[in-house]
C-alpha cells in the first residue's frame, strides 16, 4: 500500500458515457493523453487499467475502465480518483512544481510575512488560477503567474498583491 504522499493525482472520473460502461476521464496531465502512459493506481495502491476509446472536444478522455461493462457500473465511478506513483514521474526543472506539492503551502507577502495558504490551483481553460485562503478565512482567486506569484519554493510562495479590505 502506498501513502497518499507518494501518490500524485493525475485524473478523475467525471461521469459515464454511453451504455457500454465507458467513462469520461478528466486528465490533469498535459497533454491529456499522457495519463495513458502512466501506471495508474487508486488511493489504496491497487492497479487501475484504462483504455482510450476517444477524446471529446473538451479534451476529456472517453475510456474503458478495468472490467466495467455496463452503464450502471460506470455510474458508480463518478468522482473516482486516479493516481500515479510520485517516483514514476519525470524529474522537474528548477522552476517547475506539481500542483500536489503547492497545495497547502504558506503564502507570504512581499515582506515575507505569512498571510495565508494555497487552497487550490484551478484551470478553467484560460490559464491557471490560484485559490488562496487568507488568515482571516476569506479566499480569493488570482491569476497564477509571475506577476502575482513572483517566487515559488518547496516551502512557500510569495504573493505580489494588495488586498482590498
Curated annotation (Swiss-Prot):
Keywords: Chaperone, Cytoplasm, Ribosome biogenesis, rRNA processing. Disulfide bonds: none annotated. The keyword Transport does not apply. GO terms for molecular function: ribosome binding. It is found in: Cytoplasm. Residues 94-165 form the PRC barrel domain. The PRC barrel domain binds ribosomal protein uS19. Belongs to the RimM family. This is Ribosome maturation factor RimM.
Amino acid at each position: 500500500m502506498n501513502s497518499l504522499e507518494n501518490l500524485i493525482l493525475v485524473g478523475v472520473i467525471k461521469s459515464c458515457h454511453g451504455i457500454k460502461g465507458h467513462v469520461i476521464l478528466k486528465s490533469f496531465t498535459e497533454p491529456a493523453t499522457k495519463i495513458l502512459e502512466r501506471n495508474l493506481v487508486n488511493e489504496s495502491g491497487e492497479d487501475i487499467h484504462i483504455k482510450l476509446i476517444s477524446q471529446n472536444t473538451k479534451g476529456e478522455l472517453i475510456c474503458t475502465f478495468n472490467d466495467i461493462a455496463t452503464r450502471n457500473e460506470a455510474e458508480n465511478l463518478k468522482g473516482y480518483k486516479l493516481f500515479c506513483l510520485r517516483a514514476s514521474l519525470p524529474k522537474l526543472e528548477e522552476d517547475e512544481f506539481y500542483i500536489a506539492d503547492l497545495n497547502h503551502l504558506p503564502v507570504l507577502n512581499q515582506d515575507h510575512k505569512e498571510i495565508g495558504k494555497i487552497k487550490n490551483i484551478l484551470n478553467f481553460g484560460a490559464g491557471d488560477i490560484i485559490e488562496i485562503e487568507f488568515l482571516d478565512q476569506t479566499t480569493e482567486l488570482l491569476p497564477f503567474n509571475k506577476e502575482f506569484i513572483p517566487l515559488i519554493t518547496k516551502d512557500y510562495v510569495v504573493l505580489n498583491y494588495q488586498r482590498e479590505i
